[in-house]
Amino acid sequence: AETAPAAPADSVPASVEKPPAKKRGKKPVGLTGTSRKAPSASVSKLITEALSVSQERAGMSLAALKKALAAAGYDVEKNNSRIKLGLKSLVGKGILVQTRGTGASGSFKLSKKAAPEPRKGKVKKPAAAKTKKLVLSRDSKSPKSAKANKRAKKSRTTAAQKAARSGRKTKEAKVKQQRKSPAKARAAKPKAGNPKLTQQKTNPRKATNRK
């Protein structure tokens, strides 16, 4: 009778130790839930990439989208519901525009706001063009200044040439005057010599008379 109460004392701690084992088993369930949420982001990326590649103006249908995703290596049959949820979320965010149909069925295309990358490239090109225009405007201004400098130099050279020509003309005029003045002096000298000759001619007669 004394050994009987010892057995239930051993069974009580065993029952107390079991609940923490059950709590540990609940943690992996939360991890699996987080792992299921991750593929939705990849699905939305694949959908946006497929629509950016498509050249259809009216948009891409759901069947064509599934084909593009399957070609990219995505399992469409297992993740059909995720594709539809991804399409709805993208339409709600404004990244996609539904051109036809309702809900997940129909055709979709990227909105203008969802493609900023090509616009950035287009914006960068005009910026480079503006810099080129500024450089060209600076270069265009420099030839004008060079032309103005050339004109100023030409005006200076022409003024110097005119001054040199006027100096030459004055020198030539002086030389001509100097040439003319000795000729006049020469012409005047013989006139002064004629009376002497007459005196010499008259002098012999006077000598004969004296004789």
Curated annotation (Swiss-Prot):
Record's comment on post-translational modification: Phosphorylated in early spermatids. Citrullination at Arg-57 (H1R54ci) by PADI4 takes place within the DNA-binding site of H1 and results in its displacement from chromatin and global chromatin decondensation, thereby promoting pluripotency and stem cell maintenance.
Q: State the UniProt keywords alphabetically.
A: Acetylation, Chromosome, Citrullination, Developmental protein, Differentiation, DNA-binding, Nucleus, Phosphoprotein, Spermatogenesis
Q: Where is the composition biased (Basic residues)?
A: 121-135, 147-156, 176-189
Question: Any one Gene Ontology biological process term?
Answer: nucleosome assembly
Annotated InterPro entries: H1/H5, Histone_H1/H5_H15, WH-like_DNA-bd_sf, WH_DNA-bd_sf
Which top-rank group of organisms is this from? Answer: Eukaryota
| Composition-biased stretches (Low complexity) | 1-16
Residue spans of biased composition, Polar residues class: 32-42
Which CDD domains does the record associate with it?
H15 (cd00073)
Please tell me whether the keyword Nucleus is annotated for this protein. Answer: yes
Region: Disordered; residue ranges are: 1-42, 101-211
User: Where in this protein does the record say Citrulline is found?
Assistant: R57
Q: In which tissues is it expressed?
A: Testis-specific.
**What are the Phosphothreonine sites (modified residues) in this protein?**
T158
Name this protein carries in UniProt = Histone H1t
Source organism of the structure: Sus scrofa (Pig)
